[in-house]
Design a protein with these regions (language model features):
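Catalytic loop of the DD-peptidase/beta-lactamase superfamily, centered on the K-T-G motif
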Residues: 1-124
Length: 124
């Protein structure tokens, strides 16, 4: 988990960990930008990562708010494992979450619950 957190912190810090630059800001921006073309059919239940998201380099990237049932901010990005592991980074909220839950049958329930609890706890 600690390596994942350091990676997420590096992404949130636009390529830096502590005082060390690992990748440039431009690389982070490129990785977290949508690279799907306009011809990709996203209006299907089989489209992963889901409505409101595009796809960057290894991440689902939220392009719109109000479309996805998942709480979050425009520009946040995430990815998940089959059995329930999950992380997301929300630059607007300066937020990183890494969850190493293992529950194939309840993974979406736990992911939604975690997101709801985290975003409800944010005080503006």
């Amino acid at each position: 988990v600690s390596d994942y957190m350091r990676f997420c912190q590096m992404m949130l810090n636009k390529g830096k960990v502590g005082n060390k630059i690992i990748v440039s800001k431009n690389i982070v921006k490129y990785m977290t930008s949508n690279h799907l073309g306009k011809n990709i059919n996203r209006d299907t239940p089989y489209y992963l990562p889901g409505q409101g998201y595009g796809f960057g380099l290894g991440f689902a990237v939220r392009e719109n708010t109000g479309i996805s049932p998942w709480p979050g901010s425009k520009g946040e990005y995430f990815w998940a494992g089959y059995a329930g592991t999950y992380f997301w980074i929300d630059p607007k909220e300066e937020l990183i979450v890494v969850s190493m839950t293992q529950s194939v049958t309840n993974r979406n329930h736990f992911r939604m619950l975690l997101r709801n609890l985290v975003y409800q706890a944010i005080i503006n």
